[in-house]
Amino acid sequence: MRCLPVFVILLLLIASAPSVDAQLKTKDDVPLASFHDNAKGTQHKRIINWCCLIFYQCC
C-alpha cells in the first residue's frame, strides 16, 4: 500500500513529460523515414548476398 502513491506520482510525471516530437527542428534534422529506408535497403542487400552465397538461385 505504501508503493501506490509513489506509483501514481510516477505515472503523472511520465504523462506530463515532453515528448521527442515537441523539440524544435533545426536545419540539420533529417526525417526518420530516410534512415528506415536506408536500413531496409541494406538489410535487403545482405539477404540477397547471403542467398547467393548459399543457394546460387537468387542471383
Curated annotation (Swiss-Prot):
Location relative to the cell: Secreted
For this UniProt entry, the molecular function terms from Gene Ontology, in alphabetical order, are:
sodium channel regulator activity; toxin activity
Provide the alphabetized UniProt keywords.
Answer: Cleavage on pair of basic residues, Disulfide bond, Ion channel impairing toxin, Neurotoxin, Secreted, Signal, Toxin, Voltage-gated sodium channel impairing toxin
Residues making up the propeptide: 23-44
| Signal peptide, first to last residue | 1-22
Cellular component GO terms held in the UniProt record: extracellular region
Is Disulfide bond set as a keyword in this record?
yes
Question: What is the reported tissue distribution?
Answer: Expressed by the venom duct.
Q: Which cysteines are joined by disulfide bonds?
A: 51-58, 52-59
Additional record remark:
Negative results: shows very weak inhibition of neuronal sodium channels rNav1.6/SCN8A (14% inhibition at 200 nM), and rNav1.7/SCN9A (7%).
Comment field on protein domains = The cysteine framework is V (CC-CC).
* Family assignment from sequence similarity: Belongs to the conotoxin T superfamily.
What role is this protein assigned? Mu-conotoxins block voltage-gated sodium channels. This peptide inhibits the cardiac sodium channel hNav1.5/SCN5A (33% inhibition at 200 nM, 50% at 400 nM, and 55% at 600 nM). Does not interfere with the voltage-dependence of activation, but affects the voltage-dependence of inactivation of hNav1.5. In vivo, intracranial injection into 9-day-old mice causes transient symptoms, including extension of the body and clockwise and counter-clockwise turns, that last 3 to 4 minutes.
Q: What is this protein called?
A: Mu-conotoxin SrVA
What organism is the protein native to? Conus spurius (Alphabet cone)
